[in-house]
């Protein structure tokens, strides 16, 4: 239980279904950095308040060391090398659905539940229904080859962040709010008198809170100013405060003037240079083919064929031809896709079933 409305309602629904529920707050990050306050103490208090309201046990699992090593250090290293990682995906893979799951099971739990906007199914039943909440008994939930399904609320769907969890972990997981929209979740939380019903959603880095990525990285990576150049002429257009801050397709934060928007089309980490253009049709901004490595499949790997892909959270699903190769796979979307950058995840779907995905090479 994170202290937000989603996990609060998830716990309440499980209690109403007759589950023996224990609320667990994961203490993953408590460090206050200069000018940045981590909200963990407030979140902990909110989670505990809801647990008391529901009359359920409350525990704290301290994963700070593991989180720093598995998530934060990974994120920092990726940015150092000029890639664009997603720490929320790594947090789900290494902490929530691995370390937390293992700890909960060893502590006597049969399953875990989270407040993610996602659903679980196997083609026969699915957990979560827009008309009424249907949460299967444990015996039904521990199923072979469980499928990760998109949430009913497409705007809040979080399967993009969940694509690297295992089928085994998914079979021991419940997503009680996946069948509801966000407005429904807030209304239902309010009807149950949960103090988090109107709490704003977290917008910061996973578990770190309202901290901008630039401010956070500046605490761990030496900032080295460098040149911003026109990608075609090589003309120096301005200065930047660290090439690792910039990602392909980025438009804001350069203050180059001239009245035209500039887009990042490349960077050279060895030279600490960022390359930009005013041409939105620049070939470096668009991909007709996407190469993925470090593949992960929730169940079996799909066969070659046409699927749907999502290149970032809340991006629309687009059709693409998938071809499995020896060291990864290639995706060829129906139309070129803008701003595909090394290090980001591309997630593959078969309609509303999340199959898995990989990292852009």
Model-found features: residue ranges?
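AMP-forming adenylation/ATP pyrophosphatase catalytic core
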Residues: 31, 113-120, 147-361
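ATP-dependent adenylation/nucleotidyltransferase module used to activate substrates
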Residues: 1-128, 134-135, 141-163, 174
């Amino acid at each position: 239980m994170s202290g937000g409305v989603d996990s609060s309602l998830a716990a309440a629904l499980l209690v109403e279904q007759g589950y023996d529920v224990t609320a667990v707050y994961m203490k993953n990050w408590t460090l206050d950095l200069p000018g940045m306050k981590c909200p963990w103490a407030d979140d902990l208090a909110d989670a505990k308040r809801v647990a008391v309201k529901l009359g359920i046990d409350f525990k704290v699992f301290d994963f700070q060391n593991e989180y720093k090593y598995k998530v934060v250090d990974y994120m920092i290293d990726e940015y150092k090398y000029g890639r664009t990682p997603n720490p929320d995906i790594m947090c789900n893979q290494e902490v929530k659905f691995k370390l937390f799951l293992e700890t909960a099971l060893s502590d006597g739990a049969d399953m875990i539940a989270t407040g993610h906007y996602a659903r679980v199914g196997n083609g026969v039943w699915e957990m979560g229904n827009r008309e009424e909440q249907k949460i299967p008994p444990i015996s039904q939930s521990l199923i072979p080859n469980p499928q990760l399904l998109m949430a009913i609320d497409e705007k809040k769907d979080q399967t993009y962040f969940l694509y690297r969890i295992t089928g085994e972990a998914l079979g021991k997981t419940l997503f009680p709010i996946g069948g509801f929209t966000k407005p429904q979740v807030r209304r239902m939380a309010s009807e149950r008198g949960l103090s988090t019903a109107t709490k704003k959603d977290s917008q910061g880095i996973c578990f770190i809170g309202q901290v901008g990525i630039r401010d956070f990285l500046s605490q761990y990576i030496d900032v080295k100013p460098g040149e911003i150049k026109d990608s075609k002429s090589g003309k120096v257009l301005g200065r930047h405060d660290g090439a690792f801050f910039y990602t392909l397709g980025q438009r804001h934060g350069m203050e180059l003037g001239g009245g035209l928007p500039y887009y990042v089309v490349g960077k050279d980490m060895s030279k600490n240079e960022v390359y930009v253009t005013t041409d939105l049709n620049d070939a470096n901004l668009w991909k007709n083919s996407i190469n993925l490595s470090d593949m992960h499949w929730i169940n079996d790997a799909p066969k070659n064929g046409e699927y749907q892909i999502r290149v970032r959270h809340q991006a629309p699903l687009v059709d693409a031809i998938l071809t499995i190769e020896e060291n990864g796979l290639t995706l060829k979307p129906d139309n070129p896709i803008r701003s595909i950058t090394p290090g980001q995840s591309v997630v593959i779907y078969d309609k509303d079933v999340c199959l898995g995905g990989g990292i852009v090479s």
